[in-house]
Amino acid sequence: MAGVLAGECSYSESGVSSHSRNSHEKQEEVSRWYFGRKEIEENSPSRLDGIDLKKETYLRKSYCTFLQDLGMRLKVPQVTIATAIIFCHRFFFRQSHAKNDRRTIATVCMFLAGKVEETPRPLKDVIFVSYEIINKKDPGASQKIKQKEVYEQQKELILNGEKIVLSTLGFDLNVYHPYKPLVEAIKKFKVAQNALAQVAWNFVNDGLRTSLCLQFKPHHIAAGAIFLAAKFLKVKLPSDGEKVWWQEFDVTPRQLEDVSNQMLELYEQNRVPASQGSEVESSVGGGSAQRPGSRNAVSTDEHVGSRQTSSVRSTHEQSNSDNHGGSSKGVLNQNNENGGGEAANVSVDNKEEIERETKESSLHLESHPAHKDNVREAPHNSRPLVEGPGKDNSEREGGELQDDGAVHKSRNVDVGDALISQSPKDLKLLRDKVKAKREKAKKLLGERTRKKDLMDEDDLIERELEDVQLAVEDEKTKERKVQSRPKAENSDLMGTEHGEILDVKGEVKNTEEGEMVNNNVSPMMHSRKRKMGSPPEKQSEGKRRHNSENGEESHKTSRGSSHHGDREHRRHSQENNHS
């Protein structure tokens, strides 16, 4: 780094305090840190040293993640972290990654940002925390940095780096952020202020990992963040007469589109093929201090329709693959070149995908209520969702079943950063499992239907029994009306004693008094009638009526017999007289 310091003296000599400049020079000072995207990507010093765009993009995300972690451990505000990140972006626009250790420069930028934003942290604390993060794979790092020799070496490295950063930036430490214009604009909208502000704030924080701050002014970035947040939340931003909302930011539609597209590109870049191996192992995301486990899922009608979707996954520990730091690196460059990889990546979900999954979930719960107890909401954090080829991907966390169309499609799943396609054999197994689950669900529905049918049959039987009871009462009423008239059918009851009745087979059955016998009634009806038997008064009345009927029949029979004997006697006497 001493060579870098010597080579940058021209920047130090040209640095002049800002109070001696006039307003025109101040305007030039602000505008000199904004460049075209082509210039940033094609003409950077790193490109001249053989580092391609993809590698530089990865390195940019890496030091952003490192600064986010460092700032959170030092407990500095998010604005201070953002200032440190912008210092780094500006430094590496003029310096090459091949000649400077990005984490040493990032540590210097955090130390400077604390002083610029009036939230300073002692140099000793900055060095201790930085050393522990960089050497996190070394369990004895926290003890090594307490050694005087190691600490003095790191202190000298940071102080020399501070001179290099100041000279490279031309001692221009004025930085403006999108946070203030964003909050002021949302206050005017008066539409879902809390949710809109939080999501837009997250977009601004994620945008720090890109080169947007070198291309667009802060209020342009704020407009792009609000635009994406409104699309994500499906909120219609108000217009003041003929003036639309984005005109508040003095931004053109072209600029708004560019900012939005570059923010969305960041999420697409999180999917990096494993074939890049040692060069770029994975995409390292810069987490947000203001984003406590929130899950960003962004979609816009204009820009996101054709975007590739990816699940939220955690980044992996990085190995020592980056060797572009030069021979002059200090102890900070010995272990774990990619130490900032603890933060989680937040990727974009397509709006149509989210709506489809929600619809499938609701349909499944309506048709299978038994599964409702097992449903869990998707966690709002960045836990890794890694699926293997042999895993049943048709069964989701809430017990949801994908439709046949979704199961038949070949899907890419994340295993680390590699993209693995499922084989036809695995898909066949998935189809069989889905089919078995559906058959099981149908059986459950069938059992519920049968139970309902049984209940309906019970109701019908009960109604029939009520009708039988009414019929019995009608028969009793008719019987009372014809008590005085003789009936030929009553001859079957002759010869019975004490209410004993002969059935069809000639067997004697003891029946309850006052109970009517019906050979066609089933045993269930008999039991029903016993439960619903006549009260004692009716039973005694029936007994008296039965006895009287038997007496009348006996009397009529005896009287008929006596009359018949008299007639025979008279006829016999007359025949004797004639003879």
Curated annotation (Swiss-Prot):
One of its GO terms (biological process) is cell division. Residues 349-380, 389-414, 474-512, 538-556, 563-579 have a biased composition (Basic and acidic residues). One of its GO terms (molecular function) is cyclin-dependent protein serine/threonine kinase regulator activity. The modification Phosphoserine is found at S423. It comes from the Eukaryota. Residues 11-20, 306-334 have a biased composition (Polar residues). Residues 1-27, 271-419, 474-579 are annotated as: Disordered. InterPro entries: Cyclin-like_dom, Cyclin-like_sf, Cyclin/Ssn8, Cyclin_N. Residues 274-283 have a biased composition (Low complexity). Pfam families: Cyclin_N, CycT2-like_C. Keywords: Cell cycle, Cell division, Cyclin, Phosphoprotein. Belongs to the cyclin family. Cyclin T subfamily. This is Cyclin-T1-5.
